[in-house]
A protein has these predicted regions:
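Mid-to-C-terminal catalytic subdomains of enzymes
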Residues: 179, 183, 187-233, 238-242
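C-terminal boundary motif of the adenylate-forming
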Residues: 239-246, 286-288
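Flexible glycine/acidic-rich beta-alpha junction loops that bind and position SAM and/or redox cofactors
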Residues: 204-216, 249-253, 290-295
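Short, conserved charged micro-motifs
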Residues: 258-270
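Short, aliphatic-rich beta-strand segments
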Residues: 78, 245-256
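Short, low-order "capping/linker" segments at domain edges
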Residues: 293-304
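Alpha-helix N-cap and loop-to-helix initiation/capping positions
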Residues: 34, 126, 218-221, 263-266
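ATP-dependent adenylation/nucleotidyltransferase module used to activate substrates
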Residues: 2-5, 11-194, 250, 269-280, ...
């Protein structure tokens, strides 16, 4: 599989566009131009490729990459979605729906990260083993079909936080066209909105194993319980929610503007009773709300 280099001029984070404000504001036109330059750089880079596999989860980033690649290369793009216990069915459904709506070539494959003891042990670099499993499959598909490039949806904001999963794509020569073009999450949401992608305002997503504290074993039973608990919250109208699984305790991380609603007596009773019916003994609401990589906080405490 070949690895190519995109040569682009990146704008700084302070130059990224915002969906807030009006066109008449003094900074709107330069910001819009900056976004359009990034989009043009992405389109040019994609058009230089003969064919491409997109690691397509159906999240904000990979959905936009799939859209942009399909726009540039048409049927020469294959979007591949992994099906495993760690991947919520809700997200697979979104991936299928968007692929059908926009006409992507879409393939769903089974991955077996749960068969890897090193993954189930849930070390701090658990994501590496999951990504290694995924790209082992994608590399095989690429070889069978003569597709020279695999790409993921990493963006320019993903350089922060603790992300051991990024090592695996580097080992397989996976490209990150959104990152290479300087596109941030905010940029991608705005471009997705313009393109009519229903994923443009989807909350950030991560695999279900990310709800389990490091060094606590990942099991099929835990993943099913977490998925069912989060489905309860989605059905109750909560958009941003993570059920952090602490054995018999469900610690709910919600959007900051949704915490008050969860604590209303009637709603609190509904959440508590439904999650206890699933098997949790205690249900708590984290007063700090949802934050990216919150379980990494425990890693930092272990290092003190």
């Amino acid at each position: 599989m070949t690895k190519e280099t995109i040569s682009t001029t990146r704008t700084t984070r302070s130059g990224r566009t915002s969906t807030r404000g009006t066109v008449g504001e003094a900074t709107s036109l330069p910001l819009a131009a900056s976004l359009e330059r990034k989009e043009a750089a992405l389109d040019l880079a994609l058009r230089e490729l003969p064919s491409l596999i997109v690691a397509y989860s159906g999240g904000v980033d990979s959905a936009y990459l799939a859209y942009a690649a399909h726009r540039a290369l048409g049927s020469s793009v294959l979007c591949v979605t992994a099906d495993s216990p760690s991947y919520p069915e809700r997200h697979r459904a979104i991936a299928r729906r968007v692929a059908e709506q926009f006409g992507f070539n879409h393939l769903v494959i089974q991955t077996e990260e749960m068969a890897r003891p090193e993954y189930r042990a849930n070390p701090a670099n658990r994501c590496y083993f999951c990504k290694h499993e995924l790209y082992t499959h994608l590399s095989a598909i690429a070889g069978e079909r003569g597709i020279p490039v695999i790409a993921d949806g990493s963006n320019a904001d993903d350089r922060g936080d603790y992300r051991p999963g990024r090592q695996a794509p580097r080992e397989f020569g996976v490209r990150s066209p959104l990152d290479e073009s300087g596109l941030t999450k905010e940029d991608i949401r705005e471009l997705s909105r313009r393109a009519g992608l229903p994923t443009w305002d989807e909350p950030a997503s991560a695999c279900l194993s990310s709800r389990i504290p490091y060094f606590s074993e990942v099991t099929d039973e835990k993943l099913r319980l977490i998925e069912r608990a989060e489905a309860v919250l989605h059905d109750l109208g909560f958009r941003i929610c993570r059920v952090r699984h602490h054995d018999t305790i469900a610690r709910l991380e919600l959007g900051r503007d949704e915490i008050a609603r969860a604590l209303e007596p009637e709603m609190a009773e509904t959440i508590d009773s439904q999650l206890r019916a699933l098997g949790y003994a205690h249900v708590t609401v984290d007063l700090r709300g949802y934050r990216l990589g919150s379980l990494n906080e425990a890693l930092r405490l272990r290092q003190v």
